[in-house]
């Protein structure tokens, strides 16, 4: 929910003059279909660990308005929530990847979100989904437990995160014939210590993957450089930094192989 990525960029609502299908911009959906996006992750970025899913279900006029503290302090009206995201994935033809709130959420909140999305009708949580217009449960394979928890997702050290991750994942259960592929928050760039400590503490019973975070910026984090104004030298520096990710991945894989030689994660 950064800038106009969601609002205006993807979601314009049913009553917009911009051509749309169920609120999703037709031109954007068509472009994403042409690219062939296989998996779409939401809610992305730092917003994930301050997002509370119950704020984004039910009639839009009754949804809770919050301040998006990470991205501009703008008011987030939660008109794009779980049902809207699943509609977007359906239109694109891709798999949803849900990022659970570990930073400011609770185990119960995470568990009930999975139940809301994937459990057959019958429980109070699943029945609420039905009341909100979705009779059949969705198929949700990919579940990320926390986002960038070494930074905006809670400023955690890897030992603490691993402990919290294992606690959360224990209550993220398969519902019916929906089987979860649980993903732990991986390191920031070349933080090999994070990978080492995380891999010491988890195994395939806890996680199927870890997510590596890497950003290509021309300068440093405070002075990233312009996205539209740059010379040839700056362009090639950016490409060089982008290619460096291959070396970083290889070093993280070496650490993972030490603790997981069978490549279960």
Identify what each model region corresponds to.
Residues 151, 221-239, 262-265:
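Active-site clefts of carbohydrate-active enzymes
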Residues 207, 212-220:
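Anion-binding catalytic surfaces of enzymes that hydrolyze or transfer phosphate/sulfate esters
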């Amino acid at each position: 929910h950064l800038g106009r990525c969601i609002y205006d960029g993807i979601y314009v609502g049913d009553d917009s003059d911009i051509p749309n299908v169920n609120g999703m911009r037709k031109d954007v959906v068509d472009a994403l279909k042409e690219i062939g996006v296989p998996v779409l992750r939401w809610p992305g970025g730092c917003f994930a660990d301050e997002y509370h899913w119950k704020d984004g279900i039910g009639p839009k006029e009754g949804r809770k308005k919050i301040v998006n503290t990470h991205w501009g302090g703008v008011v987030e009206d939660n008109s794009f929530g779980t049902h809207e995201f699943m509609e977007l994935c359906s239109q694109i033809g891709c798999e949803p990847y849900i990022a659970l709130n570990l930073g400011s959420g609770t185990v119960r909140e995470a568990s009930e979100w999975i139940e809301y999305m994937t459990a057959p009708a019958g429980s109070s949580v699943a029945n609420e989904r039905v009341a909100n217009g979705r009779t059949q449960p969705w198929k949700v394979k990919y579940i990320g437990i926390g986002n960038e928890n070494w930074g905006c997702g809670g400023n955690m050290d890897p030992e603490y995160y691993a402990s919290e991750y294992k606690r959360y994942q224990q209550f993220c259960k398969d519902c019916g014939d929906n089987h979860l592929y649980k993903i732990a928050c991986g390191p920031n760039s070349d933080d090999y210590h994070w990978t080492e400590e995380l891999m010491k503490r988890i195994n395939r019973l806890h996680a199927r993957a870890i997510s590596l975070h890497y950003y290509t910026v021309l300068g440093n984090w405070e002075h990233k450089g312009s996205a539209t104004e740059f010379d040839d030298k700056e362009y090639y520096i950016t490409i060089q930094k982008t290619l460096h990710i291959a070396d970083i991945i290889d070093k993280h894989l070496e650490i993972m192989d030490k603790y997981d030689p069978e490549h279960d994660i």
